[in-house]
Each structure stands twice: as structure tokens, then as C-alpha cells.
A protein has these predicted regions:
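Flanking helices and flexible, charged tails adjoining ferredoxin-like Fe-S electron-transfer domains
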Residues: 2-12, 142, 189-214, 218-219, ...
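Mid-to-C-terminal Rossmann-like scaffold of FAD/NAD(P)H-dependent oxidoreductases
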Residues: 2-12, 158-161, 337, 341-375, ...
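Beta1-alpha1 glycine-rich phosphate/pyrophosphate-binding loop at the start
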Residues: 3-69, 73-74, 78-109, 150, ...
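Rossmann-like dinucleotide/flavin-binding elements
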Residues: 4-9, 55, 65-67, 110-115, ...
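Cysteine-centered iron-sulfur cluster-binding motifs in ferredoxin-type domains/subunits
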Residues: 16-26, 121, 125, 154-169, ...
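Iron-sulfur cluster-binding cysteine motifs and their immediate structural context
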Residues: 77-80, 169-183, 187, 218-221, ...
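Ferredoxin-like iron-sulfur electron-transfer modules
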Residues: 139-155, 159-160, 189-203, 232-247, ...
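A Rossmann-like FAD-binding core segment of flavoenzymes
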Residues: 205-261, 321-409, 513-514
Length: 563
């Protein structure tokens, strides 16, 4: 449908959502809609139980037709989840999607002021008045069209990366799989059995590697590191290095599945790599039938869930249970004990694993972070929380359950990809619930323990999820990306002093200096965060959809004036 004329007299429609009882249970939404009708340029207003429902969306479309609306304001929940829905709704009726304004009267009003409904109602009136004032100043914007290169780059040849690469190649996309080690498989190459079914790790990973090597549309580069990445969603140029040889690749989407590393517990519980070893080292001994110990003690949460690493590694408990059960199968007379702070066995299958361990005679003793076990030459002292006494146990073999930690080169790769890391140097997804496989940077996706410690099953699932997200881009010849970006209009270029502050502060690396020393904003990379505009001392940069007149109109109308 062709877009409606937006430069005629402004006609605003306001739609107030009850959001069930989230908003309607605190303030009078009908009265709020009636108030909206009194505002300048508002020609229609109504309230809905759920504006995002089919009925609510149909009501918006009907009002646009019947009242010739050319601006729409929805006062409801949060734009993070629902703005795309309402933009699509008005677009179907011929309005430019940027002639829509979202007013959050739930998160910013009724949720935080639920005990003060009278004051919340007055604040909601202010928010709608301000949102309507901005809507009057809105201008139509064009979405940016980008041509897509239907190829994918997967960084990391572990189980998550291989799963992702196989999925993409089977969908018909040219796929490049990059692995820095000389063999695919990652940590699976060194494990013995996989929980909870105790499948042989080598057989499992070799089958996946065989599928990768025989796959069509899939090129594998082992002993290869990423050296440089340029471009944006749909058009990435990647330089990799394999055995000192540089190779140039191009891709439309990138999947990051570089996995994680294992903590070496130096200076923790007397670790020596011989009698006091890690679970990872125990796997090798079990595979080679090198376990002869009679008294075996395992300590959980070694180097994790503390001030230095406050997170739970999630796989350590199940790994300990698995290895303890294998030891009991190999050496039935062995005394196996697990010292734990908390046991993490989610789901019925994993809980059943724990029950099996108890039935096999494996002992569990809970210890406290403030009273850590004391490891001596051939015995260990532990304060038993349940009986309130210190207990002494002999050991022939002490096994330390250490966490998965972020790779040392994550920072370097994050800088190349222009994506963020979280506080523990794992990669940070765009949103843990809404966009768990995406980065904030369009066209780059993540899976496996690169973003957080996960087990094999979860790593495979996340690898497929990342491939699925990447395919939503690669399956199109062109895509539209955000139009509300920063810009340096021609009429403002004489204001630019070339200070380059905008280049330094841009978190998406969307601004660069050209060969002619002019500032250039790559709109396909820009997310419209506004940092550059806020730091530009000469006001040369314009933030589309958040222009000075639009923001000032909200401020002035809040104070009882207009601009």
C-alpha cells in the first residue's frame, strides 16, 4: 500500500492499553483516553484491554481509515517488545512506520507507582501529553535497504560451531567453518563419556566431524585465526590466517561459537596435577584405565561462585556425578565422596542421575564457602553443615571441579567483531530472553559456551538456534535495517570541526574518517543510540527520530509551553 501523505494537517490518534491489570488495575484507562482527546492535534482516542491483540490492532487500522490519522501514539507497555508490532500495523494502513510513537505507561508508571494510583494517573497524563507533542514533530524515514551475500562464517569448530555450520550448509548457504586448533571437536576430543547416557565422547564427536567433512557448501579451515573483520550485516569481509597464509572470505552473517576454557586451579586445595587433579584430567585417566585409588574425594565449586568468579559453571555437578558413577562401575570397592556447596541437577533426567549416585553408595557432604575444606597430605578436613562437626577423611585421589572460563582471546575477537563482553569476559547477547542468540550488532549471532557455560546438549541446541537466526538474514536477497540512525546532513557538514570525538565514542564503530578527511556515518552499522550526537560540540550530527525539535517539544509541553 502506498504511504499516506504525512505533511498534511497533523491528525493524531491515541490508543491507551489496559495491559490486563498491569495498567488498568492501577489507573483509569478510559479517563486517560478521554483526557487524550483534549490534547492539541488529537482527533481520536480510545482505550483497549490489550492493544497488541488482534482486536486492538484492528481497532488501530480502523481508526486510521475512518479518521484519516497520520500519526499514531500507543500508551502501553514497552517498545522493546511491542514497537515492531505497532509499526508493522500502521505500515499496513499506508503510514510510514516512523510516524508512530510509543509511550510507556506500564514500566515507567504503573509498575513503579502502583501504590500511588492518583499520582500515577497524573504522571500518565504527562507522558501521553509529551508523547503526543513529539508525535506531531515526527517525520517519515526510509528504511535502509542492504543487499545480502548468502554466505555464513562460523567461528569455532566445537560441537556448537559444527552444529551451526552443518545446519547452515544443509539449508543451501555457503558456509565457512574456522577453527584455531588443528582439529575440529574442541573439548569433546579429550572427554571420556557424556552425561547423562554415558555415550563415548570420541565416537560422538567423530560422527559429527565426519558429517562436517562430507557436507556440501561447507569449507573447513583448521589451524586458522581471524585477523580482521570489516563491513556490516549482509556484507562482511573477513581476513583469516592459516599457517602464516592469509585468506580473504566474504559472508552475510557470522556465528560466534568459540567455546570456553578450563580453569587451572593453581594454589587451590593443593592442586599438583598428580594426586590432586581436575575433573578434566580425571577424564583422561578414566579413558586410559589409570585409576587405582581406593579413596576418592571430589570438591565442587573450586574457583567459582566466589568473589573472583561469582557465577555457577552449571556443568561441574553433572560432570562430577558422571565421573563418580564411572569410577564405581570400574572399581566397585572404591569409596567415592563429593563435597559440595549446592548440587545443580536440573530436569528429571539429571535428577535421576543424582539418585543413581546415592544408590551406588557415593557420599555427599555439604560444606560452606566460609569454612572451606582443608586439604592435607593424605587426608582432608571438612566441616559438615548437617551435623555441625568437623570430619576427617583419607584420600588417595583428590578431584577438583573447576569452572569453564572465558577464552583469553575473547577481548581481541570482540574488538574485531565490534561486539560486547560481559563482566566475566564471556560474549554478551543482545537480550537474555528476547534475543538470546543475537548480538546487539545486526548480522552476528552466538551459540554455545562462548556466552556462558553450557553442557553438550545445550551447546548443540544453541548452535542450531544461532544458525536459524542467521538464516533469517541469508534467506533474503535484501533486508531493511533501522532508519532511525545518526546522520551528518550536507547542510551541517560545515559545522563539523573534525575533532573525531564521535569516532571514539561510537560503540558500534559506525563512524569513520574518509580519505578526504570528512566524517562518514555508516548507517547500516548505526543503531541510533545517540552517543555521537550528544558528544558533538558543534551540533553537526542529527539523530533521526530524536531530533532537537522532537525532544524539545516534549520538554516544553511538560512545562506547559509549546514550540
Amino acid at each position: 500500500m502506498p504511504e499516506r501523505e504525512s505533511k498534511q494537517d497533523v491528525r493524531v490518534g491515541v490508543f491507551v492499553c489496559h495491559c490486563g491489570s498491569n495498567i488498568g488495575g492501577v489507573i483509569d484507562c478510559k479517563a486517560l483516553a478521554d483526557y487524550s482527546k483534549t490534547l492539541k492535534n488529537v482527533v481520536y482516542a480510545e482505550d483497549n484491554l490489550y492493544t497488541c491483540s488482534e482486536t486492538g490492532l484492528a481497532s488501530i487500522k480502523k481508526a486510521i481509515k475512518e479518521h484519516n490519522l497520520n500519526r499514531v501514539v500507543v500508551a502501553s507497555c514497552t517498545p522493546r517488545t511491542h514497537e515492531p508490532l505497532f509499526r508493522e500495523c500502521i505500515t499496513e494502513e499506508g503510514l510510514n512506520p516512523y510516524l508512530f510513537n510509543f509511550v510507556n505507561i506500564r514500566d515507567q508508571c504503573t509498575w513503579v507507582h502502583m501504590k500511588y494510583p492518583k499520582e500515577a494517573f497524573e504522571k500518565a497524563k504527562d507522558l501521553i501529553r509529551m508523547g503526543t507533542a513529539k508525535a506531531v514533530k515526527l517525520e517519515p524515514l526510509d528504511m535502509i535497504m542492504i543487499k545480502i551475500n548468502p554466505a555464513a562464517l562460523v567461528i569455532g569448530g566445537g560441537v556448537a560451531g559444527m552444529s551451526s555450520a552443518l545446519s547452515l550448509s544443509r539449508q543451501g548457504f555457503k558456509t565457512y567453518l574456522i577453527e584455531k586448533e588443528d582439529k575440529l571437536g574442541g573439548r569433546l576430543n579429550s572427554l571420556y563419556k557424556l552425561f547423562p547416557y554415558e555415550i563415548d565422547s570420541t565416537e560422538f564427536v567423530e560422527k559429527i566431524i565426519s558429517n562436517v567433512n562430507s557436507a556440501q557448501n561447507l569449507e573447513v579451515y583448521t589451524s586458522t585465526k581471524v585477523k580482521n573483520i570489516e563491513g556490516f550485516v549482509g556484507n562482511y569481509e573477513i581476513e583469516v590466517e592459516q599457517n602464516d597464509k592469509k585468506i580473504n572470505l566474504t559472508a552475510g552473517a557470522i556465528v560466534v561459537a568459540v567455546g570456553s576454557s578450563l580453569l587451572t586451579p593453581k594454589n587451590l586445595f593443593g592442586y599438583d596435577g598428580k594426586v590432586r587433579i581436575t575433573q578434566y584430567e580425571l577424564e583422561t585417566k578414566l579413558r586410559n584405565n589409570e585409576i587405582e585409588a581406593k579413596d576418592i574425594i571430589m570438591i565442587q565449586c573450586v574457583g567459582s561462585r566466589n568473589d573472583e568468579r561469582p557465577y555457577c559453571s552449571s556443568v561441574c555437578c553433572m560432570t562430577a556425578l558422571k565421573n563418580a558413577l564411572i569410577i564405581k562401575d570400574k572399581i566397585p570397592y572404591a569409596n567415592v565422596m563429593i563435597l559440595f556447596r549446592d548440587l545443580y541437577t536440573p530436569g528429571t533426567e539429571y535428577e535421576e542421575y543424582y539418585r543413581r549416585a546415592r544408590e551406588k553408595g557415593i557420599l555427599f557432604i555439604k560444606y560452606d564457602l566460609n569454612r572451606l575444606p582443608i586439604v592435607e597430605e593424605k587426608q582432608i578436613k571438612v566441616y559438615n553443615e548437617y551435623i555441625g562437626e568437623e570430619m576427617i577423611f583419607p584420600y588417595d585421589l583428590l578431584v577438583l571441579s573447576t569452572p569453564l572460563i572465558a577464552n583469553n582471546d575473547n577481548k581481541e575477537l570482540a574488538q574485531l567483531l565490534k561486539v560486547p563482553l560481559e563482566s566475566n569476559n564471556f560474549f554478551l547477547e543482545a537480550h537474555v530472553k528476547l534475543r538470546p542468540s543475537d548480538f546487539a550488532t545486526d548480522g552476528i549471532f552466538i551459540g554455545g559456551s562462548a556466552k556462558w557455560p553450557v553442557d553438550i546438549t545445550e551447546a548443540i541446541t544453541q548452535g542450531y538456534a544461532a544458525a536459524s537466526r542467521a538464516s533469517t538474514i541469508l534467506s533474503h536477497e535484501t533486508i531493511k535495517v533501522e532508519g532511525a540512525t545518526s546522520s551528518l546532513p550536507e547542510y551541517n557538514k560545515n559545522l563539523c570541526s573534525g575533532c573525531e570525538v564521535c569516532i571514539k565514542v561510537c560503540p558500534y564503530h559506525a563512524i569513520k574518517k574518509t580519505e578526504t578527511d570528512e566524517i562518514e556515518i555508516i548507517e547500516a552499522l548505526c543503531k541510533g543510540c545517540g552517543v555521537c550526537g550528544a558528544t558533538c560540540t558543534n551540533q553537526a550530527i542529527v539523530i533521526k527520530h530524536f531530533t532537537d525539535p522532537q525532544i524539545l517539544s516534549e520538554i516544553f509541553v511538560f512545562g506547559g509551553k509549546e514550540i
